[in-house]
Amino acid sequence: MKVKKWLLAIAAFAVIAVMMVLCAVCAGAEAYGNFEYGVLDDGTVEITGYKGSEQKVDVPEKINKKSVTRIGNLAFKNCTKITSIAMPDSVVYIGRSAFYNCTSLKSITIPDGVKEIGYAAFSECAGLVSVKIPDNVTKIGDSAFINCANLTKIDVTAGNKYYSSANGVLFNKNKSEIICYPAGIKNVGYS
C-alpha cells in the first residue's frame, strides 16, 4: 500500500513538472503580425512560426527593434500557399525543416548573411524550381532539398568557399562530391 501511494506521488509530481515546462515554452512564444517568434539569449529574434495565408511573404528585418537572425525549426511547415518568401540579410541560420512541405514555393534566394541551412530545410517543396546559395553559407544539412520534385537549378555564388554548382547540381567546393542532385534535372550524368 505504501509503495502504491509513493508511486502515485511520483506520478503526480511528474505530471506537474511537465505542465510547468509546457507552460513556460508556450509563454515564450510571442506574435508580430502573422509571425510567431522568440527572443534569443543574445537579444536577437528567431521566427518560430507563421500563421498567415499570403502567397508572398516578407520576413521583417527587425521585430520590436531586435534583429531577426534565425528561421527556426519547422517555422513555415505546411505553409502551402506561399509562392515566394523574402528574408532579410540579418538572417544567419535556417533551421531544420524550416520550410517543410511549402508545396507552392517556386524559388528561394538565400540571404547573404546565412551561414547554415539545416537538415531538410526545404524538403517536400514540390513547386521549388531554383535556389541561389550565397558566399557565406558554410554548412548545408543533409536532405536540405529532398523530394523537391521540380527543382532543376541550385546556383552557388562564385565566392563561396565550401560549395559550388555546375549544370544546376550542388557540389562541394572542388566538385569531388555531389551534395544535391536536383530531382527535376533530366538527362545530365556524372561519373
Regions found by a protein language model. Give the residues of each.
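Glycine-rich loops and low-complexity Gly/Arg-rich segments
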Residues: 9, 74, 177-179
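Bacterial N-terminal signal peptides
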Residues: 11-23
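Sec-dependent signal peptide cleavage junction
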Residues: 20-33
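N-terminal secretory signal peptides that target proteins for export/translocation
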Residues: 1-6
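Structural signature of tandem-repeat unit edges
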Residues: 34-43, 52-70, 80-93, 102-116, ...
